[in-house]
Amino acid sequence: MQVKDQLSSLQPYKPGKSPEQMKEVYGDHSFVKLASNENPFGCSSRVLDELQKSWLEHALYPDGGATTLRQTIADKLHVKMEQVLCGSGLDEIIQIISRAVLRAGDNIVTAGATFPQYRHHAIIEGCEVKEIALNNGVYDLEEISSVVDNDTKIVWICNPNNPTGTYVNDRKLTQFIEGISENTLIVIDEAYYEYVTAKDFPETLPLLEKHKNILVLRTFSKAYGLASFRVGYAVGQEELIEKLNVVRLPFNVSSLAQKAATIAFGDDVFIEEIVRVNTEGLQQYESFCRENDIPFYPSQTNFIFLPVENAGEIYEACAHAGFIIRPFPNGIRITVGTREQNEGVISVLQQHFENKKRKSRDEENA
């Protein structure tokens, strides 16, 4: 059976390893998962209370248009319901966008170190992928702008960026958008929007009134603590959302997921507390790094990236201590956990870097 030639160059997405997978390698003890940027505190208690009442609905198909959820999102964001598209996580929405917009021979432009699904789906659609290196961990919009051409159908901007946690500020993003043709779709992936505390972070939704080629993505998987429910959404011009809905699978968001997301979206107190605790957790890591001269990227997310050597060694050390982190070729990404979990990881990092310094001194004195 023949499939697309380009699939031979791709691999299925590999998420962070589960505790069960880790036990097969590192033994049967407990593991703390800090690899996939989930909320360690779970979701709003309102969600749990309400879902207890919903078990009898499961024999019925969900609302295919996610009407209540979309209206809830629209009301809070001050847009029309027709401007909102819901999907089974942002992964599905990225797939929908790629399938709807891209043709063989087109190209997309994005960063070299960013969420890999932009590249993945472009290749499936037979497109060229132009990847621009980050500048000190941040999207280099000037360089991205310089390679956009008539065949560029999508520019993907992950802001804040995954895996570095860095962000493009309001001035730079606005300037970039002004310089891009309206024939090119600019997708701004704001999966970590709720965690942002920077005063100059862009408010992108007002830009939709002026620019027809902008699509903003957000999710319930991170701050809202609903990763297993798989709910993400896009906000854009009505005409574009209407076309994307043609590609969307019917009944793509389950009834439980719709109800959970609708309830969670109304619990601002929960989000405020999550952001407060997350900010304290980031400060734990940043203080440790500064005190020990360990490089890191200041983060506007619920994770921190350390651009260090020997990521595999650090991953192994954390794994043996019961912590699952995410290694990269040029560093490690650690999800912010509870205070105690953060302290545990920091203790492992402290030991690793002390051993590294000791080994370096021994080699110099040999």
Would you name each region that the model predicts?
Residues 123, 141-150, 163-186, 192-221:
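Active-site pre-lysine segment of PLP-dependent enzymes
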Residues 312, 317-321, 325-366:
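PLP-dependent enzyme catalytic core of the Aspartate aminotransferase-like
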Residues 279, 287-321, 336:
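Conserved PLP-binding catalytic core of the aspartate aminotransferase-like
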Residues 2-89, 96, 366:
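N-terminal small-domain helix-loop-helix segment of the aminotransferase-like
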Residues 157, 188-189:
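Hydrophobic residues in beta-strands of the RecA-like P-loop NTPase core, especially within AAA+ ATPase
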Residues 100-157:
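PLP-dependent aminotransferase-like
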Residues 33, 295-299, 325-327:
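Short beta-strand
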Residues 65, 213-290, 294-297:
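PLP-dependent aminotransferase class I/II
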